[in-house]
């Protein structure tokens, strides 16, 4: 099957924003106008195509990143009339599902950042913006909900500049705001666009309304100055007072958008069907194709040499698995982005992370949760594979004769955990397998057994995250379970460097056990995790035993020395040791490594850490004092406050342990008129009094 759309006419985009900015509604309108839908679904009716999980329909929020493909030929611009393929990923706005945004942005070439014209830049807008900056994703901004009372396009543009440190450049300004929002002025063509009907497919081009002409001229000059700053030829023409053509503006705007020096800003009301087609034109005009993004770099799995893959069909196949999902009809689905080459259904691929070769059973083009079998998938495309059993999120799949490992994805560790118990024997039999499947899909969901109580603990990014997963256990896997109260996922670390000898000797007749290691443990910067350095010289420990020492240390780190919590941000150097020709074994050195680490950690000033959350509360004026007092009583540190969209906002850093049940308390404190958002910020040392009570709990557990 030949390629239907040239690679330079492919756009892989994400739709990203704060919760309730209108992402899913906007995607529904895109699918309607591009011919993928014949009837539009509404989020508030639970009928949105992209929200296909039961939990999403009930809550009216997007939890997983649904993927779909559509085609669009722009009405205006340098690409007018040329058919383009757009692969869209609709991402969640709730902070508990931040991993879905992270893994989507890793494989996208561009994004539409949605902002609510009333709320402006909200906390999750900042989070997804930082994630997009991390991957250098070009963006256009779409100010949605212009029909809402209190909508203010220019305030939103100002907030993008100030709160996101971005360079927003409006290429449209609205004609009317709130109930009288009627259309926009196109600053490139200097024409007005007035929508006739609510279906948005009919509009009239008009001269710019008289009362907007001065404002339109001012904003056009602003746009011309912005594009002139990034192109010397254009700057010369602008300074000489020469005319700058529409085509020249678009070419330079595209270049500046691709290097993220300019964010073009558009406006609309997706719910009222206004603005979506022009936003699609902008996606094609300004966002990157795989050709613009260029080659990806990886390394050879054995030699570690740099390997470059160009985005061409003729190159060897290389792709990145960015999402695992369980489909009730076809089983395990692996979503992947093709960076180079072509992949045919039925062919074999190598997973360079596990070293295993696997067969691709089927290749599917996904449309939300519907699927369409295709023969093959080309460079630059996004698709789903059936038949890959051992592939995890972030793994590279490639041509077995041309191996490459692409950059892995790094996910945050869970900050909250709950105990879960099956209700019946039948539930007990299914629980382990079901939890394993959920953990396979979601890298921020972890399952472990409490060594002391024998309970199964599940950990995630927030209360809603775990609530959704427990609900999925019941609906998808038919497992009934009771859950305990949420618990904070505390951590432990050390504050000073220490050297220690770990020795394991056992002589009981016959072959004994012997392993001796000298370890240096020292603290790492926050967030660095764990580092093991082999500094052994002169063969005092045979090479085959070194990995066993590392394994023993990592095993010991799971159960900290202060209160039994996992340890982090530690560097361990193995610098000396001894072995016995007959009695030494991998097991002996693993135990010696564990003993050595535990002994060193106890002397290295170990401390307990707790997750600190970044909290923003938006409240009416009259409750501001109560809200601030309450946050302070929760050991919160107020970092800033201000006014936005007619309400007060407070930013604070608060320990997670003090935030359980906060939504209920905030509702009663403000008569339901305030709301808040919360995301993980960092780990900090626990105050002495709390550390002592946690240690006492551990001691009482051990003596029971």
UniProtKB/Swiss-Prot annotation:
Protein's UniProt name: Elongation factor G
Keyword annotations of the record: Cytoplasm, Elongation factor, GTP-binding, Nucleotide-binding, Protein biosynthesis
Domain of life: Bacteria
Native source species: Chlorobium phaeobacteroides (strain DSM 266 / SMG 266 / 2430)
Family classification: Belongs to the TRAFAC class translation factor GTPase superfamily. Classic translation factor GTPase family. EF-G/EF-2 subfamily.
PROSITE patterns xref list: G_TR_1 (PS00301), G_TR_2 (PS51722)
CDD domains (alphabetical): EF-G, EFG_III, EFG_mtEFG1_IV, EFG_mtEFG_C, EFG_mtEFG_II
Residue ranges of domain tr-type G in the record: 8-291
SUPFAM superfamilies in UniProt: EF-G C-terminal domain-like (SSF54980), P-loop containing nucleoside triphosphate hydrolases (SSF52540), Ribosomal protein S5 domain 2-like (SSF54211), Translation proteins (SSF50447)
GO cellular component, one term: cytoplasm
Residue stretches in coiled coil: none
Localization, UniProt: Cytoplasm
Molecular function per GO: GTP binding; GTPase activity; translation elongation factor activity
Its job: Catalyzes the GTP-dependent ribosomal translocation step during translation elongation. During this step, the ribosome changes from the pre-translocational (PRE) to the post-translocational (POST) state as the newly formed A-site-bound peptidyl-tRNA and P-site-bound deacylated tRNA move to the P and E sites, respectively. Catalyzes the coordinated movement of the two tRNA molecules, the mRNA and conformational changes in the ribosome.
Gene name of the encoded protein: fusA
Pfam families: EFG_C (PF00679), EFG_III (PF14492), EFG_IV (PF03764), GTP_EFTU (PF00009), GTP_EFTU_D2 (PF03144)
InterPro entries in the record: EFG_II, EFG_III, EFG_III/V, EFG_IV, EFG_V, EFG_V-like, EFTu-like_2, G_TR_CS
One GO term (biological process): ribosome disassembly
Annotated binding of GTP, by residue: 17-24, 90-94, 144-147
């Amino acid at each position: 099957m030949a390629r239907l759309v040239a690679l330079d006419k492919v756009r892989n985009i994400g739709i990203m924003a704060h919760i309730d900015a209108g992402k899913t509604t906007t995607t529904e309108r895109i699918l309607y106008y591009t011919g993928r839908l014949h009837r539009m679904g509404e989020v508030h009716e639970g009928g949105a195509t992209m929200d296909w999980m039961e939990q999403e329909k009930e809550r009216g929020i997007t939890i997983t990143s649904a993927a779909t493909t559509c085609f669009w030929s722009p009405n205006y611009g340098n690409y007018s009339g040329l058919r383009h393929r757009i692969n869209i990923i609709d991402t969640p706005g709730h902070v508990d599902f931040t991993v879905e945004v992270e893994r989507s942005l890793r494989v996208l070439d561009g994004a539409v950042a949605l902002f609510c014209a009333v709320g402006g830049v909200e906390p999750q807008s900042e989070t997804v913006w930082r994630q997009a900056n991390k991957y250098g994703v070009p963006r256009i901004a779409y100010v949605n909900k212009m029909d809402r009372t209190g909508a203010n396009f220019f305030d939103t543009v100002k907030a993008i500049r100030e709160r996101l440190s971005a360079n927003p450049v409006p290429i449209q300004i609205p004609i009317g705001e709130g109930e009288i929002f009627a259309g926009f002025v196109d600053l490139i063509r200097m024409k007005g666009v007035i929508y006739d009907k609510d279906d948005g497919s009919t509009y009239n081009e008009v001269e710019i309304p008289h009362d907007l002409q001065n404002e339109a001229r001012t904003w056009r000059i602003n746009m011309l100055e912005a594009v002139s700053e990034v192109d010397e030829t254009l700057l010369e023409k602008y300074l000489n007072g020469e005319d700058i053509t529409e085509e020249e503006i678009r070419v330079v705007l595209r270049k500046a958008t691709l290097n993220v020096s300019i964010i073009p800003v558009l406006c609309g009301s997706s719910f009222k069907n206004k603005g979506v087609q022009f936003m699609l034109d902008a996606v094609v005009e300004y966002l990157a194709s795989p050709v613009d993004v260029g080659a990806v770099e990886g390394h050879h799995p054995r030699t570690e040499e740099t390997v470059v893959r160009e985005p061409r069909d003729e190159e060897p196949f290389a792709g990145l698995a960015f999402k695992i999902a369980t489909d009730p009809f076809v089983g395990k689905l692996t979503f992947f982005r093709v960076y180079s080459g072509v992949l045919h259904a039925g062919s074999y691929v190598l997973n360079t992370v596990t070293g295993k070769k696997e067969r691709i059973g089927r290749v599917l083009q996904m449309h939300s949760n519907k699927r369409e079998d295709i023969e093959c998938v080309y460079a630059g495309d996004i698709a789903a594979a059936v038949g890959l059993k051992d592939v995890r999120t972030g793994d590279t799949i490639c041509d077995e004769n041309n191996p490459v490992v692409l950059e892995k994805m790094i996910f945050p560790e869970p900050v909250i955990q709950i105990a879960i118990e099956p209700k019946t024997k039948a539930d007990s039999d299914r629980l382990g397998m079901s939890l394993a499947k959920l953990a396979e899909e979601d890298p921020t969901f972890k399952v472990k057994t409490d060594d002391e109580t024998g309970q199964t603990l599940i950990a995630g990014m927030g209360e809603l995250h775990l609530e959704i997963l427990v609900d999925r256990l019941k609906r998808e896997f038919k497992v009934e379970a009771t859950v305990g109260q949420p618990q904070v996922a505390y951590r432990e670390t050390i504050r000073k460097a220490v050297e220690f000898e770990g020795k394991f000797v056992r002589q009981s007749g016959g072959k004994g056990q012997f392993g001796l290691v000298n370890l240096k443990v020292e603290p790492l910067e926050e967030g660095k995790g764990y580092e093991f350095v082999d500094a052994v010289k002169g063969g005092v420990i045979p090479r085959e035993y070194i990995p066993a020492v590392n394994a023993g240390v990592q095993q010991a780190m799971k159960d900290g020395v202060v209160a039994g919590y996992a340890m982090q941000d530690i560097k361990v150097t193995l610098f000396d040791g001894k072995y016995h020709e007959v009695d030494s074994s991998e097991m002996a050195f693993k135990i010696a490594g564990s003993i050595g680490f535990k002994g060193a950690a106890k002397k290295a000033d170990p401390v307990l850490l707790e997750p600190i959350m970044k909290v923003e509360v938006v409240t009416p004026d009259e409750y501001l004092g109560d809200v601030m007092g309450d946050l302070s009583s929760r050991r919160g540190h107020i970092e800033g406050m201000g006014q936005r969209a007619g309400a007060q906002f407070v930013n604070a850093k608060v320990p997670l342990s003090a935030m359980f049940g906060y939504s209920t308390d905030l509702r009663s404190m403000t008569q339901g008129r305030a709301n808040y958002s919360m995301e993980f910020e960092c780990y900090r040392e626990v105050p002495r009094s709390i550390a002592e009570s946690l240690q006492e709990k551990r001691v009482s557990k051990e003596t029971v």
